[in-house]
């Protein structure tokens, strides 16, 4: 079948490489664009990466606590309204509410010292 031949050729040339796709997606979502591991897994799968490769790639991503700290969390030291807005933003990126609260509290404590 011609379609299978074309797909196989693309795989051999590295154009259809799930590991590369994961790396490319992860690169786009680093630093200020950081997302939770759970969110990243969903992105990988939505982009057509196989479940097996996507789950294996998760070990290469920073844990959620580290990735939250990569974000601009200056608002964590702000007033209640700013902190609430930041918490909603982080929740929208797939971070667990308990992790968000704990991390923001740590940042606030560090700022006081």
Which residues does each PLM region occupy?
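An alpha-helical, amphipathic repeat domain used for nucleic-acid recognition
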Residues: 1-113
């Amino acid at each position: 079948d011609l379609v299978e031949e074309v797909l196989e050729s693309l795989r051999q040339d590295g154009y259809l490489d799930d590991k590369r796709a994961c790396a490319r997606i992860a690169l786009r979502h680093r630093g200020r664009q950081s997302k939770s591991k759970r969110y990243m897994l969903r992105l990988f799968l939505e982009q057509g990466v196989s479940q097996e490769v996507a789950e294996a790639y998760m070990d290469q991503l920073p844990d959620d606590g580290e990735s939250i700290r990569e974000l601009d969390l200056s608002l964590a030291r702000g007033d209640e309204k700013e902190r609430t807005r930041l918490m909603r933003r982080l929740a929208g990126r797939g971070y667990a509410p308990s992790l968000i609260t704990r991390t923001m509290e740590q940042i606030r404590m560090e700022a006081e010292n």
